[in-house]
Design a protein with these regions (language model features):
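Thiol-/selenol-based redox modules, centered on thioredoxin-like
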Residues: 613-646
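Conserved redox-active cysteine motifs that mediate thiol-disulfide chemistry
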Residues: 526-527, 533-551
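Short, internal strand/loop/helix patches
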Residues: 511-513, 576-617
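Alpha-helical repeat scaffolds
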Residues: 165-180, 204-219, 241-254, 275-289, ...
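A short beta-strand-turn-helix
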Residues: 510-530, 554-555
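Glycan-association/targeting regions that enable binding to alpha-glucans and other polysaccharides
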Residues: 22-215, 227-253, 276-287, 313
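N-proximal helix/coil linker or "cap" segments that precede and/or mark the start of modular domains
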Residues: 437, 445, 449-509, 523-525, ...
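Structural microenvironment flanking redox-active thiols in thiol-disulfide oxidoreductases
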Residues: 544-585, 595-601
Length: 646
């Protein structure tokens, strides 16, 4: 209690000093702090002068502050990457004299801050590394872990695509080296992030150094399952497969029912076909591993399978049998999209399932039961919870609509539309379709037009808009021109966005073997636009994008070379797994086998799928991450190719 009183007294005293003696601030630099050497548990004032930055002339500036710890922190799942970020939050700054300021109470548990500043449209990342605010001890010494912690907070997701971790790897490595020269014991606290930076900076030249560090960390008397997984994963990353297999074997011997064994056995669930096979597998699996963390998703998949099969009563019976066991909603919502109109009570069991999701999601939205994720600001976290509730309401509205209750469905879909702030393509489409069913053609048309112009589109939006157009005009004459105008506006905005993201980085050369055994080099396509699509057979979003990529390949076959680079492949027979996927789906793709992940690493790929677009001059011009949908992918490629051809 006394310590709390002292802190409150310090805060009151500090505020009084500001009011009495700090009537002016020094904004001579772009970024500074008061005090110059801040401490944990104290108030720090961030001072920012945007003159000469992208934020010069802003009417409002906000700061995003990322606080970090003095070590890598392991998430609940040992399979997730460690992360030393304690919290991320956004603060609106106050205008003062020639600049902006904000006062922040620094938590006791952190050793530094990283700050970025932004207005409504632009962000000052300080060239990608953020503004660094290390914390100091009461003796005015740099806190142990402050330097390595700063680098680690950037290695872990950085500032999204704005931080090129390959470009800045040497800089980040310098912070680790400074830290370890001052505090050698800290190397063990930052093993994961340090190895990541070392590998990015030195490539294969770092392997021996990483192995030496791994040997120092290997203590059989203190083996935990987490440590064995860490050792195996990193030996694998530096291409020492013998050691990687050794520690994997030791883990299976020491923890025969451990999380690693469970995860591998759980993979068999996704090879089963249909609700019956999947349920039989999960029943046996849960009897063996009752506490497996991934079972909730598998339960959701089973409910979804019943729905896709039209077995709505069985879906409900299985749902009821779960009692208080958790089940994932995503596969259920996905399955609901396949529900056809049945104007009777056959679908009513689905309403009871989805209503449970609506109730839980609304409670989480209004009063979350879990802490805010450390890498999300409060407003973004609230948007995430709002989207979860919106998807539950959207699913409820879809089923209600399929049962013929169009007016009731409109209520749910309208709330979903409002919760997602018009930014979710599926919700927008469904709301417009149900408005149309309720006779509100003008409102449906306005929603679809606004969504398409904003680049938020599903393939079915064009069909619905065409139906409205014909119903209003009496024929489809003129629709093509009308729709083209909408797409032109969206395309212009998309091109502006992509042009602002263009880079010019020399593309690393490579030679790989394709599925026919022929050697293929990047230099074979000199003077041509090349798209490298990094993927793997286990990657769901990669495979989901392939129908769209087939359309892109057919459209640009003569002017653009698309190479599908199979990397991070886990199949025992990699080549056969790739060939089977191509043949089963009739994909005419030119696939290169990156069996040693050398190209994956030389291009600094961190997730799958990633598309790297290389210009005619041999430079990397753009990177596209993940898969958001067919329309978005094709529009993005159209825009990039148009820019590079101009």
């Amino acid at each position: 209690m006394m310590m709390r009183f002292i802190k409150i007294y310090r805060w009151l005293f500090f505020t009084a000093c500001l009011m009495i003696s700090c009537s002016s601030y020094d904004f001579s630099g772009v970024f500074s702090t008061l005090p110059a050497k801040p401490q944990a548990g104290e108030i720090v004032t961030l001072l920012y002068n945007p003159k000469g930055t992208v934020l010069e002339g802003s009417n409002q500036v906000s700061a995003i502050v990322r606080t970090y710890a003095d070590r890598d922190l392991q998430p609940v799942s040992m399979f997730s990457m460690p992360n030393n970020v304690v919290d991320t939050e956004e603060y609106k700054m106050k205008r003062k004299q020639d600049g902006w300021l904000i006062e922040i109470l620094v938590p006791d548990s952190v050793v530094g801050l990283v700050v970025t500043l932004h207005n409504e449209t632009d962000t000052d990342y300080d060239e990608g590394l953020g503004y660094w605010v290390p914390l100091y001890t009461s003796e005015q010494h740099l806190f142990p872990g402050a330097e390595a912690g700063y680098a680690a907070s950037l290695v872990r997701r950085g500032w999204g695509a704005k931080l090129d971790k390959t470009l800045y790897a040497d800089t980040l490595l310098g912070f680790y080296n400074n830290e370890f020269s001052r505090n050698p014991a800290k190397k063990a606290d930052f093993s994961f992030s340090y190895f990541s930076a070392l590998k990015k900076s030195k490539g294969e030249d770092a392997y021996l150094e990483i192995e030496a560090n791994l040997e120092a960390l290997d203590n059989p008397d203190q083996w935990t399952e987490e440590q064995l997984f860490f050792l195996s994963a990193w030996y694998g990353a530096v291409k020492n497969q013998e050691k990687a297999d050794y520690f994997k074997t030791k883990s299976r011997e020491k923890f025969p029912s451990g999380r690693w064994v469970q995860r591998e056995e759980a993979g068999g669930f996704y090879k089963k076909v249909g609700s019956t096979e999947k349920k039989e597998f999960l029943d046996e699996f849960e009897a063996k591993y009752p506490d497996h963390s991934g079972s909730s998703y598998m339960r959701g998949v089973i409910i979804g399978e019943y729905i896709k099969e039209g077995s709505y009563k069985q879906a409900f019976e299985y749902f009821k049998s779960l009692n208080d066991k958790l089940w994932s909603e995503r596969p259920v919502f996905f399955a609901v999209n396949s529900v056809k109109d049945i104007e009777n009570d056959e679908l009513r069991p689905l309403l009871e399932i989805i209503n449970k999701s609506v109730t839980v999601s609304r409670k989480e939205y209004e009063d979350p039961s879990i802490p805010k994720p450390p890498l999300k600001i409060s407003s973004t976290w609230k948007e995430t919870r709002a989207t979860q509730l919106a998807l539950a309401l959207d699913a409820y509205g879809l089923v209600t609509n399929a049962m013929g209750n169009n007016t009731e469905a409109l209520t749910y879909c309208k709330e979903a539309y409002q919760l997602t702030n018009k930014q979710h393509k599926q919700v927008n489409e469904h709301y417009a379709a149900i408005l149309l069913k309720n006779g509100s053609k003008a409102a449906a048309k306005e929603i679809l037009e606004e969504s398409i112009i904003s680049g938020i589109q599903t393939p079915d939006m064009e069909k619905i808009l065409k139906e409205i157009f014909i119903g209003t005009q009496g024929s489809e004459e003129g629709f093509t021109s009308y729709y083209s105008d909408l797409k032109t506006k969206a395309f212009g905005d998309l091109k502006d966005k992509i042009e602002s993201e263009l880079v010019t980085q020399r593309a690393p050369s490579f030679t790989l073997t394709d599925t026919d055994g022929k050697e293929v080099s990047l230099s074979d396509y000199k003077g041509k636009i090349v798209i490298l699509d990094f993927w793997a057979t286990w990657c769901g979003p990669c495979k989901a994008s392939f129908p769209a990529m087939k359309k892109a390949r057919n459209k640009y076959e003569k002017e653009v070379k698309i190479l599908f680079v199979n990397s991070k492949e886990t199949a025992k027979d990699k080549l056969q797994a790739v060939k089977d996927l191509m043949e089963e789906n009739n994909y005419p793709f030119h696939v290169l086998m990156d069996n040693k992940n050398a190209v994956f690493e030389s291009y600094g790929i961190s997730l799958l799928p990633t598309k790297v677009i290389i210009g005619k001059d041999g430079n990397i011009r753009h990177r596209s991450f993940g898969f958001r949908g067919e329309t978005e992918l094709l529009d993005e490629l159209d825009a990039i190719i148009s820019i590079l051809n101009s």
